[in-house]
Amino acid sequence: MGGSHIHSPQLDALRVALEEPLDRVQRHPVYAAVTTVEDLRAFMEHHVWAVWDFMNLVKAIQQRYTAISIPWTPRGDATVRRFVNEIVLEEESDEHPVGHGFCSHFELYVGSMAEVHARTDHVSRFVANLAEGLGFEAALALSDCQPAVANFLATTWDAAMAADEELLAAFAFGRETVIPVMFDRILTEAGALGNAGLLRHYLVRHVQLDGDSHSEMAKYLLTVACGDDPLRWARAGVSARRCLEARARLWDAVGDMVGAR
């Protein structure tokens, strides 16, 4: 896809319809409110859950648009397969920035939390429970995460289980469109990143990846999935709005802790 921009009347209309929730997330005061190490810890202890559940969207898309079972057969469009597998490669096994081989972005983020002595026990226990076979809902109920975090995770989970257009809208507008803007604002406005080298790397890496071809390819997938079906576009809009509203509520919760106004 390179740096090309995807255009369709329906996609353009959806962009317009989502301007308010997009603006609320992208202009949220929480980014500039992270001025102390304590603020940064609070931010990361909330945000790490979103880093984890990004992979639910990625893996749901991989399951639907690539062949991951045997006997193997070619599945779908090869360009789409390439895009999806590139995202999986980068998110699940990217190069570690300080020469420690490879790691997922979630593992990198958890490592960055250690740099600022943020708590990781809640999310680590949650992931360990999942690894031991506990279902998502049960693990979430035992996680002790904040209500805004639980709402965010449940919203993403619902999108990952929903129709293709709802999944792809959550990915395209709930993640790939807003992440570069959010992370760029944190990099430029947050005043507490001095000793958080791994976090800075994580943020810069996502601005690079999501701000380039990922966002446009995600919108391309959404456009193909919806076609000219107005009901699919309507469902996509509802899904994207729900995800953006859940993100805004997550940032509201962090803002309440760090004094964002």
Tell what function each PLM region has.
Residues G2-R261:
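Non-heme di-metal
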